[in-house]
Amino acid sequence: MKECKHLHSTQLSTDSFTHMQWGEKLSDGRLFTLMAVGKPDGIYNAGPCSQFVFGRISEDDGKTWEKPYFLYEWPDHDTSYLLLGWKIDRDGRLHVFAEATTDAPHDNPKKLEGHIAYVRFDSYRGENPLYSDIAALYRYTGSLNNIIETEAGRLVVPFSTFMGDNFVSGTIWSDDHGVSWKASNDVSVSSEETSAESGAVEPVVAEVQPGVLVMLIRTVLFRLWYAVSYDSGESWSKAKPTNLPSCNAPANLLKLPDGRILLAWNDGLGHPMADVRYSLARQCLHAAVSSDGLRSIHGARIIVKKVVGDQDRIHNAYPTASNYSENEVLLWHFEVFGKCGSSWKALQGYLVRMNPAFLEETEVKDNWAEWISDSEKTSAGIVLKNTNEIAHAITNFPYAKKGSIKLAVSGILPQGTSILLSDCYLDRLNFIPENKNGAYKDVVGEPYTRLSPNAAGEWLIEWDETEIRLSVDGKQIQTCRKNTDGFNHITVLFEKDGELRIGHFHAKAEIPDWDTGIRY
């Protein structure tokens, strides 16, 4: 079976990250993106260097791209400019933002100095550039992951900025199309982490009601956090945790033409780990849709996954999205440590087109292409064997607070075979012997419910609001309490030698609403 990296979507393009920065459909139907030429070693290159922004156009829906055309040269050759993101507003103006770094010594990762660089053009063609250092928020910034234009026409741009020990989040906004900018209060998140990437990092925002915005924040606390603004981004509430698991990675929000909100994020926990509580489980990207202003979501399905040949520590991360049509969106993300050889110095970017309708589905059957495993996968199922210290296979299904799963399993059950139900992706790295006891388990515990079948056969797993029941060949053998409100992943694993064949899979959600914990 051919491995598919992108699920429920059509891959349009792949290119170097610096050659394809987000994607948007122009009013004439063509696709537009930006590319950048920066310093060869980024923020660590102290020598003067010319740095440029170029535009690119696709006439064939992203399959091929025309030669880049010049848009702008950044003003200071000593500063390092990293293109962060851009937006074309309703009047056609192009707004471009960059991270302008003036000092980032190798020997002091917490000495980060710089500011936000901004340039506005009359259109994507680059007329009449207007440059600003955004004096209202003159601090070093990290990544930019979305930009919105509110119903009233205000531009709101979420940033996290460095405050000496970690990051705080906030927004800048403009009511005059980018001529001038103001900044909100800072939103902070406290943790015991000592990494410079802790705090309230890389926020994204969405307008959930006229003038009411919700901010989602990357943290090291195994959850996305959120804050609310009731004045279109001028001020923000204190941050609180959501119910959505997340490794230390940013999310993305996009309001669809019908008013629903699309959420994309790394719904993963655990290894690879760094520092005290720093999960980099970015192997898979997930998507969900909300019809009630992010109070609840549906779906929580994998849309980008780890494939055979990728490193276990692969990053499929940093999603950004824009509307392509009434029914489809453009989704961009980058990859690090993939089988193509991508790395932090050679990020691989991808642009796909996706119809979010599948996120409203409530059941899946025999979705073998969506399973993640080193074992053999065919159109008839999974042949699960111990490969590289563990037999491990995991798949994703529509989130269910109440639901059921049926599996047809054949073979002699290896000793210690387990079924894990979770509301997050759990990579095989979490279960190999050297990682089973470590900082991750000490900090977060076991983010799953473990079931123990006593034989191969017809496995039936049912759960309601409080408990889970496991039956084998019609006989109930285990009942236990849920440790999370619902599930959207199932893992089958064992450590001993042996072989199991999974020949049928059927998951059904009876209560598909995932309460995010967001309140306003």
Ranges and model annotations:
Residues 1-363, 374-375, 493:
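Asp-box/BNR beta-propeller blade signature and adjacent active/binding-site loops
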Residues 385-442:
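Secretory/extracellular carbohydrate-interaction modules
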Residues 407-409, 455-472:
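Short tryptophan-centered beta-strand motifs in secreted/extracellular beta-sheet-rich domains
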Residues 480-506:
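Flexible glycan-contacting loops in extracellular carbohydrate-active proteins
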Residues 507-520:
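Extended recognition patches within non-cytosolic domains
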